[in-house]
């Protein structure tokens, strides 16, 4: 028979393995019911419930023991799963703090936002823990569909456009994933990754056509989710159409989930040592690191620049997946951990400076001219911005430098000299567009008069929780060197 008989033993159920997801699913349902049976919506109550369930979930994850096969073999509670769940939950917790702003933007004033936010995180937790293609697809859909809704909650044209684009690209990615899973099911008779990997190791590629179809479709699906070139075109517009809080969310959380899935999926493909498979990954990495870097040089809006730089950072993470060693896996987690904290801080800064009026540009919310002379009008904000610029540019000893250092080191140790050279060259290119933001803040003259600056239009969205998150992220970025030992032990 093509398919082995299905034997279900409740000894392998392991209820604890799905407890983190159940916490958030139950939390989302509870929050939904609270809103349904209360006459008046309370943003503070909803945010408190969100934070409470995220903290409970994080504590549950910390208490889990590693187990290779759980929940009837569908889940794997390995280091990859537990570390990525931790990064997802920490990022989600920090980002929900940024919603505590003075300006009452529509998306944070709706009862639907908060339960959907919890459902999204639960979906990503299923994705990073799954050892089965079907459950990965379910987690992908559970996370993707609510994201489209949250994008459109602003009610603005650009928000609706972003939601439609994300939905369209997400539907295409899901279709690609389903087609790739079908190809490997026909090839191996299973959707379980362990069975697929074992089949490829022992039997080899018995049907090159099915193998090629599966690899190409799955690369396309993951490529859309983590915005690899040439699947990246939706991302800058989606960034532009969303507020900085949600833009930072979609640049961090879905991508870490996508790269964990890529690590589980693509490791088996890379280990086949088939030349064209390696060539595809090599080409994807090179163009994903390089092309967005060059496009970012010509952007006039800081948010769009950060969108393209995020795509380039995805190329560095994919390089770690491609190298496929224990050291490169550590490098990927360190890279994305540092990237997440720095991006939360940078986008928190944009959120701090966001206003309803497009005072500086008819189209863009955050053109470079908005930051001209910020050191004179708001010195603290400018200094925080400089820290995040140094971190994103990979200037030692700031945050992302350590991720890039480990990525390049793992490439050199694996004899990928060209890959290491491309990463170093593009790191140098990235300095130019990051420092353009720095120059605007520190060396350009303010466009507005001093009396206009004193009207505090730059920080009319500021609150103490937002300042607290941004300053905390700046401290992490600044003193990341002291975190490296503990972080490497955590991801080991």
UniProtKB/Swiss-Prot annotation:
The keyword Metal-binding does not apply. InterPro entries: NADH-Q_OxRdtase_suN/2, ND/Mrp_TM. One of its GO terms (molecular function) is NADH dehydrogenase (ubiquinone) activity. GO terms for cellular component: plasma membrane. It is a multi-pass membrane protein. Its EC number is 7.1.1.-. It is found in: Cell inner membrane. The chain crosses the membrane at residues 18-38, 45-65, 80-100, 108-128, 133-153, 167-187, 209-229, 250-270, 277-297, 305-325, 333-353, 381-401, 415-435, 464-484. It catalyses: a quinone + NADH + 5 H(+)(in) = a quinol + NAD(+) + 4 H(+)(out). Belongs to the complex I subunit 2 family. PANTHER family: NADH DEHYDROGENASE. NDH-1 is composed of 14 different subunits. Subunits NuoA, H, J, K, L, M, N constitute the membrane sector of the complex. This is NADH-quinone oxidoreductase subunit N. It comes from Helicobacter acinonychis (strain Sheeba).
């Amino acid at each position: 028979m093509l398919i082995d008989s299905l034997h279900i033993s409740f000894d392998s159920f392991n209820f604890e393995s799905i407890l983190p997801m159940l916490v958030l699913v139950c939390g989302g349902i509870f929050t939904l019911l609270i809103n349904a049976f209360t006459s008046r919506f309370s943003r503070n109550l909803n945010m408190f419930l969100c934070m409470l369930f995220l903290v409970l979930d994080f504590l549950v994850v910390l208490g889990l023991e590693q187990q290779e096969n759980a929940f009837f073999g569908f889940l794997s509670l390995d280091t990859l799963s537990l570390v990525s769940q931790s990064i997802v939950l920490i990022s989600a917790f920090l980002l929900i703090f940024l919603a505590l702003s003075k300006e009452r933007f529509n998306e944070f004033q709706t009862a639907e936002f908060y339960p959907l936010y919890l459902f999204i995180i639960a979906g990503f937790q299923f994705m990073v823990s799954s050892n089965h293609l079907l459950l990965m697809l379910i987690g992908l859909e559970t996370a993707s569909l609510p994201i489209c809704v949250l994008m459109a909650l602003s009610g603005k044209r650009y928000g609706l456009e972003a939601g439609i684009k994300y939905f369209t690209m997400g539907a295409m990615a899901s279709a690609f994933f389903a087609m790739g899973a079908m190809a490997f099911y026909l090839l191996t008779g299973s959707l379980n990754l362990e069975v697929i990997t074992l089949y490829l190791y022992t039997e080899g590629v018995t049907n090159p056509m099915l193998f090629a179809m599966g690899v190409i479709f799955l690369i396309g699906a993951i490529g859309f989710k983590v915005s690899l070139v040439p699947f990246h075109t939706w991302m800058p517009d989606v960034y532009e159409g969303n507020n900085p809080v949600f833009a930072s969310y979609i640049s961090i959380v879905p991508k870490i989930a996508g790269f964990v899935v890529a690590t589980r999926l693509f490791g088996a493909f890379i280990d086949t040592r088939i030349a064209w498979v390696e060539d595809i990954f090599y080409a994807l990495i090179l163009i994903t690191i390089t092309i967005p870097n060059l496009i970012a040089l010509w952007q006039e809006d800081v948010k769009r620049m950060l969108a393209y730089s995020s795509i380039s950072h995805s190329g560095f993470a994919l390089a770690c997946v491609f190298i496929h060693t224990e050291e490169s896996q550590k490098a990927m987690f360190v890279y994305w951990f540092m990237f997440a904290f720095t991006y939360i801080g940078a986008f928190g800064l944009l959120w701090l400076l966001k206003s309803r009026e497009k005072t500086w540009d008819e189209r863009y919310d955050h053109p470079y001219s908005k930051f001209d002379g910020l050191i004179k009008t708001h010195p603290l904000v400018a200094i925080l911005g400089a820290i995040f610029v140094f971190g994103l540019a990979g200037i030692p000893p700031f945050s992302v430098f350590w991720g890039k250092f480990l990525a390049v080191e793992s490439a050199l140790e694996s004899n990928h000299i060209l890959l290491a050279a491309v990463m170093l060259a593009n790191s140098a290119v990235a300095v130019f567009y990051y420092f353009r933001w720095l120059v605007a803040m520190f060396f350009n003259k303010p466009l507005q008069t001093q009396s206009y600056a004193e009207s505090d239009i730059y920080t009319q969205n500021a609150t103490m929780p937002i300042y607290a998150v941004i300053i905390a992220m700046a401290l992490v970025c600044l003193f990341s060197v002291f975190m490296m030992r503990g972080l490497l032990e955590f991801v080991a």
